[in-house]
């Protein structure tokens, strides 16, 4: 009689899980001569099982074994949901349809990457993936015990899904069905456009997959540009010479892609950095600055290797880096991908060195009477053409015109790191008629361009210098009695430095009108900051600035409303008039009480604030077209009693 004993055991890798099946056959023959052999075989078999269970026997297996041996139809609802979410995501934005088996293999490759395995597996080196922040999804396999699962990084998942062409485990027929467009080099047939990529990212962030995400992070921020060039590196060959080329090459490396010209530092990618599970992800990934350029000519379909001689080295190009700060951590509320910095209701407490705002203009035929918006969150500013004259003063007799606009501030958090509500900013090119919106999921290059703009502004405006006390330049006008409307109050501002003739800028202040302790009051927070129109300029005495970028962009203003009101309503305006001349200019504001307060407003003040603010109405006024940086002081006016105090503030 023959007895076959089949023992199945599972391998638990340290960093990923797959199934390895060992078949132990012990042939027991009904013969006394073979009894001692069968006993010895049984003993050795049991010994092997015990040693395997305590993970003392080392072995290797194909990462695909997990899905090759597990019937996906036996998965739990959650596993199946994850799988089909990812498959639908792929098939929705790729023109080549994949079979379930082929996509299963792709997905398995994504899940199975051992990012801590530094050994070369065919043409793929996985150690650089260690630098990616670890936001992971854990899917438990139904055919195993509870602690058997597959782990996938949500940050590398989507990109790896579209980069499986470099894996050695995929079958050739499956690889041929995976045409990817990576770095503008058409290795295969797929047409993955920027728009489809952005939509895929958005769909990915809103899918059910995010419900199982848990946050991890590493010391280095995730960089999509760096990651895809890591893939480029891996499609060459896994030989020491290539390793040395990238590790020892001058940094950064300037490469042309279908998304523009980008800078990547391979040395930082190839440096292993341990992950940390103690902090949440803290900042949107900021790729190197891209300048739009035509896509490079396509590579033939059979060209599966990209050689290093196609990469141009530019050692003198500055590298922009970011750091995690505690203040940024306070902003992030979610770990979804792409993750927003904060919601409009989350006003973070930050150390702000500079408040800057980007403005967008709407081109309408009648600039004097723009439609009054109903949703202030997405409203854009328009400045009537009548504001372009040199007159810089207003008075109470002028007609009040409803010119509604709102502002969103992009706040400098730490060094050259900026944040903005909803993680979106607007840029407008001189050569374009329309305004283009960029979000974090689509592109973060404008933030770096904005940083370059800040360096330019810093060059000419010296906003880091100490603020001068200009309280003596107030034209102090106070309220006469509680039964009268407030008169116009003015503040004289002297520009600090005259700008070059080819640079125009506007600096405005935002003032908070608080009525305390009265409950029958309202206030709106108004923030008006600087607007810069760039032309090509020299920065020879300062840090290197990319002139092409400066010439291509004009910072513009986005919109957000922050207003609290009760009765009686009291509208509030604040505006500045700063020209390139050295003469003082006037800031005016007015308090218009619609009704007489029932009780004295003992602590009504006009003061500086750092919050995201909104100005809802402006008076019909004229304004200089050329404006510049200046030091200003804010004024506090108490209605009852009539006292005036001054406070110096830097804009």
Swiss-Prot record:
Glycosylation sites recorded in the entry for this protein: 74, 97, 147, 208, 223, 234, 254, 302, 355, 378, 395, 469, 502, 520, 546, 603, 620, 631
A matching Pfam family: Herpes_U47
Native source species: Human herpesvirus 6A (strain Uganda-1102)
Compositionally biased spans, kind Low complexity: 275-292
GO cellular component, one term: membrane
Signal peptide annotation: 1-56
Keywords annotated in UniProt: Glycoprotein, Host cell membrane, Host membrane, Membrane, Signal, Virion
Presence of the UniProt keyword Nucleus in the record: no
Region named Disordered: 275-303
Annotated family: Belongs to the herpesviridae U47 family.
Protein's name in the database: 120 kDa Glycoprotein O
């Amino acid at each position: 009689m023959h007895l076959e004993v089949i023992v199945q055991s599972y391998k638990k890798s340290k960093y990923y899980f797959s199934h390895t099946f060992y078949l132990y056959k012990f042939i027991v023959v009904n013969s006394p001569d073979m009894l001692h052999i069968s006993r010895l075989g049984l003993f050795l078999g049991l010994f092997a099982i015990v040693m395997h269970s305590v993970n003392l026997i080392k072995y290797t297996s194909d990462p695909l074994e997990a899905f090759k041996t597990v019937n996906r139809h036996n998965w739990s609802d959650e596993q199946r949901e994850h799988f089909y979410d990812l498959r639908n995501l792929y098939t929705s934005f790729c023109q080549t349809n994949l079979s379930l088996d082929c996509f299963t293999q792709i997905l398995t490759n994504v899940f199975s990457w051992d990012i801590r395995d530094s050994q070369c597996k065919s043409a793929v080196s996985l150690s650089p993936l260690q630098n990616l922040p670890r936001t992971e999804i854990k899917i438990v396999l139904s055919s195993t015990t509870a602690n058997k699962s597959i782990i996938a990084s949500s940050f590398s998942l989507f990109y790896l899904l579209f980069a499986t062409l470099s894996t050695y485990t995929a079958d050739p027929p499956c690889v041929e069905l995976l045409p990817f467009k990576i770095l503008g080099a058409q290795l295969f047939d797929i047409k993955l456009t920027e728009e489809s990529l952005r939509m895929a990212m958005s769909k990915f962030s809103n899918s059910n997959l995010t419900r199982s995400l848990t946050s991890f992070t590493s010391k280095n921020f995730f960089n999509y540009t760096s990651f895809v060039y890591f893939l480029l590196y891996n499609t060459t060959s896994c030989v020491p010479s290539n390793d040395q080329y990238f590790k020892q090459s001058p940094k950064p490396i300037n490469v042309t892609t279908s998304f523009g010209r980008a800078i990547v530092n391979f040395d930082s990618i190839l440096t292993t950095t341990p992950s940390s599970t103690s902090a949440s992800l803290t900042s949107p990934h900021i790729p190197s600055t891209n300048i739009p350029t035509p896509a490079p000519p396509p590579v033939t379909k059979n060209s599966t290797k990209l050689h290093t001689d196609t990469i141009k080295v530019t050692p003198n190009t500055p590298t922009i880096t970011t750091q995690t700060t505690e203040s940024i951590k306070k902003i992030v509320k979610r770990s979804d991908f792409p993750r927003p910095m904060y919601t409009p209701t989350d006003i973070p407490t930050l150390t702000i060195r500079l408040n800057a705002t980007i403005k967008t203009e709407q081109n309408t035929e009648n600039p004097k009477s723009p439609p009054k918006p109903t949703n202030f969150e997405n409203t854009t500013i328009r400045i009537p053409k009548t504001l372009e004259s040199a007159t810089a003063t207003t008075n109470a007799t002028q007609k009040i015109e409803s010119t509604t606009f709102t502002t969103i501030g992009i706040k400098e958090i730490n060094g050259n790191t900026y944040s903005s509500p909803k993680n979106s900013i607007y840029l407008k090119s001189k050569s374009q008629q329309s305004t283009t919106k960029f979000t974090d999921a689509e592109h973060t290059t404008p933030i770096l361009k904005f940083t370059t703009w800040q360096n330019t502004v810093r060059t000419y405006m010296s906003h880091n210098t100490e603020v001068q006390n200009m309280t003596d330049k107030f034209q102090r006008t106070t309220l006469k009695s509680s039964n009268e409307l407030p008169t116009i109050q003015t503040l004289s501002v002297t520009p600090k430095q005259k700008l070059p003739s080819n640079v125009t800028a506007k600096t405005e202040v935002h003032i908070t009108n608080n009525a305390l302790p009265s409950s029958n009051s309202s206030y709106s927070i108004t923030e008006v900051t600087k607007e810069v129109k760039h032309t090509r300029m020299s920065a020879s005495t300062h840090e290197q600035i990319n002139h092409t970028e400066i010439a291509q962009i004009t910072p513009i203003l986005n919109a957000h409303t922050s207003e609290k009101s009760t009765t009686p309503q009291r509208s509030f305006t604040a505006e500045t008039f700063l020209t390139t001349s050295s003469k003082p200019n006037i800031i005016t504001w007015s308090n218009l009480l619609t009704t007489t307060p029932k009780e004295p407003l003992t602590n009504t003040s006009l003061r500086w604030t750092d919050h995201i603010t909104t100005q809802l109405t402006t008076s019909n006024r004229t304004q200089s077209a050329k404006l510049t940086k200046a030091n200003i002081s804010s004024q506090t006016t108490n209605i009852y009693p009539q006292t005036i105090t001054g406070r110096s503030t830097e804009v």
